[in-house]
């Protein structure tokens, strides 16, 4: 289950917990007790039916550095007999998302429009995917009327055609139509599709080329509704309709809770709701939060944002409705079990955009203090901060990190008083701005806002680097020192309060504070032959600085191919393990690290319920113990339609499947989304090889697994006889690798 919805008071205490975790163990225990007491009191109050504090109340200060909120800053203006128009911009023109978004619209129909709350939608469907409701694949507009059927729309289309939902002009036209036909006192705009964080999202099969803007990232991802285009579209929509601003803008999409995204929409909305992580296929609980709005149309956007967060997953129709839940899971499971599994890594937060400028101001001060600190320690905080799924592939470390968790780690790692004070001020400002947030136990360091902090390779690459970042996240870059900090961090140039464009471009040259010069001694073996009864012991020593993670590698020699097949990889546990707010990372003692590992000839296989196939499980997330780690295997997901998509299956350390992610790119890049497997869907494993003659890496399609009624699991198997290559891989804090290998025969 996700963490309970947090009131402003609980969020304030939680941010204080982060700082305590950085500074003092006794204070940490004291604040943990206070947090538990506060949450218990809130739950008891809610159970007794006592109303929540009004949105205009001032929360208890989380730290003495907090600036008191001005009177009336807690909510927007409301009026008697207030009316709403809620606009759903639903781009379902995608194999993965079509059914989920279509059902979201049907969830809204279960509530339907009233005289004070009008619900409208523009939905674009996919050709050849979900076949429900007549399998139409056009773009339609609806005035949403009440209807209980989750699989067929009862509302009549108000317009039909085909539109490029990745075009900002399409969004402007929809908003214009909604305002002209359904004027109201307050407007909410909710956008659904693939999200990508600061680049934006919202792709469409009808889109061609690179779009309206010549930005480097478009050369890789094509025509999307990039963030600067969304900024322009919202400005045009607000200007042409004269609505002043939206009361709330929501992103029912993955990865959009970036401070860069909130900065882009801040001029056009009072409140925003978004997720830091990949959203589950369920999306938002439309029937639940719209029902709250219909029952209380006098609420403001803060209350609506809290309702969206509060109902997320736990009140979704496909969780609480028995028939819909069975259809969604393919099994007879309880609502509690489905909610718990679905919410494990889910996140959602509601933000008061009026308080965002204070966050940006505090972020500037924090960036300045980071610029004066030891950059290698800052890099360590970046690498170990709570991270989220990457759109740039697995070749680079995660670059989307939780801003609050990173600030706490930076204070801890640097031990710098100025950094700590700036982190306190930043967390206090964020505590004021974040109205509500929820996150599952697998994302314990998620606090509601992410930020982009790439490694040196991503920063210097054209598609992910300075040119794309400052062009796409333009409003944020124009009003923040963060991009200037990144330039200083990766070039060694001084950082000042003046926002300037670097000359020459930072891609041309620079430094990598997280990089380390790491060497590995030749591996010594206890024996050259390994059996199930006689394991081998591998020993070596790693020497160097900025060591992040160490991995075990196992490869199998295929004589017919004259190639080495990647068979297994795993984390080597650190000399110690530390945690900040439940996010664990290894600690290595000194620049000289002895490594010893006993290898019993073991590989791993995936069981789909009908067959078992040996598979490479890649280490994904470090945990307190091996059972708490997560692993992944990549392949091609094959839908019933025959369409293939690059995908990643995530397992926990206990052997259970946790999620399946699909990517819009062909190699694990692009927008991720959670796939809800249907019986008969297939997954083709991708095998990774190293050609011994050409010294080149390549992949081939391997065995096929099928989704059915039995949940997938992984389990250990005996390694078959043959020649193996064993080794250790040491990763520095910038994502570079040092390696040492040795051959072993398995009998």
Task: Map each language-model feature to its residues.
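Bacterial N-terminal signal peptides that target proteins for export
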Residues: 1-9
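Ser/Thr-rich, Proline-interspersed low-complexity disordered segments
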Residues: 13, 17, 22-77, 503
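Extracytoplasmic/secreted envelope proteins and their assembly/folding machinery
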Residues: 32, 39, 102-105, 109, ...
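N-terminal extension/subdomain marker
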Residues: 66-184
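Terminal, contiguous helix-loop blocks that mediate binding/assembly
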Residues: 72, 76-79, 204-207, 211-747
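Structural recognition of the beta-strand scaffold that forms the well-ordered cores
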Residues: 85-89, 118-123, 187-191, 247-251, ...
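Gly/Ser/Thr-rich loops at beta-strand to alpha-helix junctions
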Residues: 93-96, 193-199, 250, 254-258
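Short, solvent-exposed loop/turn and secondary-structure capping segments
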Residues: 99-101, 131-134, 199-204, 261-262, ...
